Amino acid sequence: MLIPRVLSRGTSSKAQRNHFSDILSAAPEVPAVIYNSPYYGFETRSELFFDLLEDFPNLIGFKEFGGAESLSYAAENITNQSETLLLMVGVDTQVNHGYVNCGAEGAITGIGNVLPDEVLTL
């Protein structure tokens, strides 16, 4: 999971592309998911995601941590553009929305660390 770099390289799309590219190229055999969290001060949009995907086939999905509106955007503009891209829910309270309304295929949650069996049952 690739988180945005916000402290030393800035929040511009170019800075984020360089950051993600450095990581993706360092481990081209490792499947990777971009972690989008607007709370970091940068929101990864579809243009940047698909720009990266052109160069890095190990980019397989998108984890959305921005809430229902951002999750819907990710589904409509990123993961629904290809059958091979995965959408992961990152906000515990949005798991239902992600699965029911957005076609999410997984969730990376905080509560899963506390109640792993119950979360796996979902």
Where are the regions that the model predicts?
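Glycine-rich, proline-tolerant flexible connector loops at the mouths of alpha/beta enzymes
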Residues: 1-17
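Short beta-strands and strand-loop turn motifs
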Residues: 1-5, 30-36
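Catalytic alpha/beta core domains of metabolic enzymes, predominantly
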Residues: 22-30, 37-122
